[in-house]
């Protein structure tokens, strides 16, 4: 939305936290589980995360920083609503995976990679 319209409103106040995971890291985690964890059954819950909680406000700040770097400053305005989707529920990461795998892409690098692809799409 920032490429097309500039400033925009967040759906919530941004205080809620999530554990984000770069898609390539998720794929590597799934491959690692398939190769190493023979006790895993299809009905077992699987929670793969970055093991690091980040607020939506922090994500917005990183995105604004990417726009600033291309000379297109935007403002992301927090909404008034509180989180009504997950209501601050947590999915606990399965720590057994840490024996074989840890995410390789931090939040800033992941956002930058996606942003770089979007820049191409929007002609920046």
Residue ranges and their predicted role:
Residues 3-124:
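C-terminal substrate-binding subdomain of Rossmann-fold SDR/epimerase-dehydratase oxidoreductases
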């Amino acid at each position: 939305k920032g490429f097309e319209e500039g400033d925009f409103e967040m759906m919530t106040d941004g205080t809620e936290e999530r554990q984000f995971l770069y898609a390539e890291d998720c794929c590597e985690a799934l491959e690692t589980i398939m190769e190493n964890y023979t006790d895993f059954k299809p009905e077992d819950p699987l929670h793969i995360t970055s093991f690091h909680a980040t607020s939506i406000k922090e994500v917005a700040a990183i995105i604004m920083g990417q726009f600033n770097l291309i000379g297109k400053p935007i403002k992301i305005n927090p909404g008034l609503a509180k989180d009504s989707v997950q209501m601050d529920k947590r999915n606990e990461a399965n720590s057994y995976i840490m024996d074989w795998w840890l995410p390789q892409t931090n939040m800033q690098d992941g956002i930058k990679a996606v942003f770089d692809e979007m820049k191409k799409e929007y002609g920046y």
